[in-house]
Amino acid sequence: MINNVISPEFDENGRALRRVRSFVRRQGRLTNRQQQALDNLWPKIGVEYQAEKLELGALFGREAPVVLEIGFGMGASLVTMASQNPEKDFLGIEVHVPGVGACLASAEDENIGNLRVMCHDAIEVLENMIPDNRLEMVQLFFPDPWHKVRHNKRRIVQPPFAELIKSKLKVGGVFHMATDWQPYAEHMLEVMNGVDNYLNLSENGDYVPRPSSRPITKFELRGQRLGHGVWDIMFKRIK
């Protein structure tokens, strides 16, 4: 596994550019299980970053609908969805190395064959590796809300990001977001409503009930017990 999660960007004169990123790089401490999974399973399930388009059919060994999840955490929900939907292929992106290791280990436990994972900046993967008009769904569950106003620009859901996601979705494909921070949910709605050729799937023009396709995480269950809300937002590409 190549540890090159953050790639540099340069201007035409070769000077490094500072890029505002939506995540904080946290290496964390690996458990033995996570390290073993990275050592043994990354060559089978992991996908190295490269600045060229993926052949998704070749990657999974078949032609099937592809779901992309950005920021899968420890991978519990992603592995569950892959297990419950064997007719679909799942590609997960996560920058937290212990989370990648945990996801790989869980995938092996469940004997999952329709899952591949990457450890790299999702924006660069989308821009350089994901073919246009190819994805059935993009999932973004509980991204960092960057609570402080001065950090709001770091939120991943911004108009250019929404446009980028749209270009990777098939017509009819869906961008599904979820957050437990209401101001971020409102921000997501504002951004998505401002981008052409998306249709909000909410009957009321705001949020949708949690679809059964999105598993409830332990974190979410704990929040529910404490009275915290969760907002699901789903927009379909219509053109």
UniProtKB/Swiss-Prot annotation:
The active site is at D144. Keywords: Methyltransferase, S-adenosyl-L-methionine, Transferase, tRNA processing. The keyword Transferase applies. Pathway: tRNA modification; N(7)-methylguanine-tRNA biosynthesis. Residues 150-155 are annotated as: Interaction with RNA. GO terms for molecular function: tRNA (guanine(46)-N7)-methyltransferase activity. GO terms for cellular component: tRNA methyltransferase complex. It catalyses: guanosine(46) in tRNA + S-adenosyl-L-methionine = N(7)-methylguanosine(46) in tRNA + S-adenosyl-L-homocysteine. It is an enzyme of class 2 (transferase). It comes from the Bacteria. Pfam families: Methyltransf_4. HAMAP family: tRNA_methyltr_TrmB. This is tRNA (guanine-N(7)-)-methyltransferase. It comes from Photorhabdus laumondii subsp. laumondii (strain DSM 15139 / CIP 105565 / TT01).
